[in-house]
Amino acid sequence: MAATIIKNGLIHDAVHREAYVADILLADGKIAAIGGGLTAPADAAVFDADGLEVYPGFVDAHTHIGLDGYGIGYEGCDYNEMNDIWTPQLRAIDGINPRDPSLADARRAGVTCVCTGPGSANVLGGTFPVSYTHLRAHETSQDL
């Protein structure tokens, strides 16, 4: 995977109190360096973010994404099991549709990680897995 450098973006992160202008070097899909005046390999893709703001991926800590039957209908809804107020045996991982278009919608909006699960209507609704919003076509909910 070729390197990518984001130049001159106004960076917001969890470390600094104030946003600051800097470059971000990405290598092998990970942040390799952040700082001013970074240089990248000759084959690196360069993205000029001058005048743009750069944020880390957002985390949605409580959602039903992938479980709500989006695009399928009611039969695809795998949350809020209404047969009991106590449903600790429910596992969201068993009901997540990895091809749910709302995963791509969330990713485009900057959400990179979600905690999705059943049971907002239940006192104890089941387990919530934490997963990324990116998937390839061949992957399953177990690969999230």
For every predicted segment, state its role.
Residues 9-11, 133:
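A short, amphipathic beta-strand motif
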Residues 69-73, 125-130:
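Short acidic, glycine/serine/threonine-rich loops at helix termini
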